Amino acid sequence: MRSVLYLLFTAVAAVAALENPFLVPPGGYQFNTREPTVLNWQPTTPGTVTLKLQMSSDITPHSGLVLAAHLENTGTFTFLPPPDLMQNGLYTVQIIDDNDPSKYNFTPSFMVDGATGGPTTGPTTSRTSMTTSEATTTSGESTTSPSSTRPSTVSPTTTDSSDTTMSTVTSSSTPTTTDSTTTSESTAVSSTRSSSTGMPTSSGAPDPNGAVSLALPGGLLSIVLSLMALL
């Protein structure tokens, strides 16, 4: 009895699996990423259907990439595979009846010409890692460059200030010392001249015999001598 029920269930499942069968061209479907391919099937269920792109080796009710959801079951769909599909991967297109998901069908397995992707999560993870690395490098450059430049800018400023101060002190001190010395010398000369001029004044009382004759002018002396000769 159980064997009969199992066979009956298998037969019903086989009939259900034949719903909306694909019309495969001679030689099978040829998919590539450069031009679209038209899928054709024989509509056998009313309402709408959903098309999914599945990996042939791993098919579950929740797996696959949805190509079209709630599509009118007209028996045709144009499909252009994306280039990031896995290279040399085996794919199949699944058609599912939206009213009864147990009614589905598949195309024969195929490979996509022009696909360049790696494993399913490979390209996404790789791109995220590269972006993070570039952001870190740019941040490191922005932080390091100004820090190493600013100390070198401060050093010349300090040196210039020291040189300027030393020059100012030296220049100011030298003229001042020279002027003071010159002034002292001038003062000494003036003092000497004053002393020389005042020497006759500070002498004792003049000699009556010598001082008068020395003080008389030449004309007056001649007159005096003439008077003395007349006497």
UniProtKB/Swiss-Prot annotation:
Database matches in InterPro entries: Kre9/Knh1-like_N (IPR018466), SRP1/TIP1-like (IPR052982)
Keyword set includes Nucleotide-binding: no
Subcellular location: Cell membrane; Secreted; Secreted, Cell wall
Keyword set, alphabetical order: Cell membrane, Cell wall, Glycoprotein, GPI-anchor, Lipoprotein, Membrane, Secreted, Signal
Pfam families reported in the protein's UniProt record: Kre9_KNH (PF10342)
Membrane topology field: Lipid-anchor; GPI-anchor
Regions of compositional bias (Low complexity) in chain numbering: 121-204
Residue ranges of the region described as Disordered: 107-206
Lipid linkage positions (GPI-anchor amidated serine): 203
Cellular component GO terms, alphabetical: extracellular region; plasma membrane; side of membrane
Coarse class of the protein's main subcellular location: membrane
Claim: Translocase is one of the keywords in the record: no
Propeptide: 204-231
Signal sequence annotation: 1-17
PTM statement from Swiss-Prot or TrEMBL: The GPI-anchor is attached to the protein in the endoplasmic reticulum and serves to target the protein to the cell surface. There, the glucosamine-inositol phospholipid moiety is cleaved off and the GPI-modified mannoprotein is covalently attached via its lipidless GPI glycan remnant to the 1,6-beta-glucan of the outer cell wall layer.
Family under the similarity heading: Belongs to the SRP1/TIP1 family.
Function: Probable component of the cell wall.
Designated name of the protein: Probable cell wall protein ARB_06477
Highest classification ranks of the organism: Eukaryota, Fungi, Dikarya, Ascomycota, Pezizomycotina
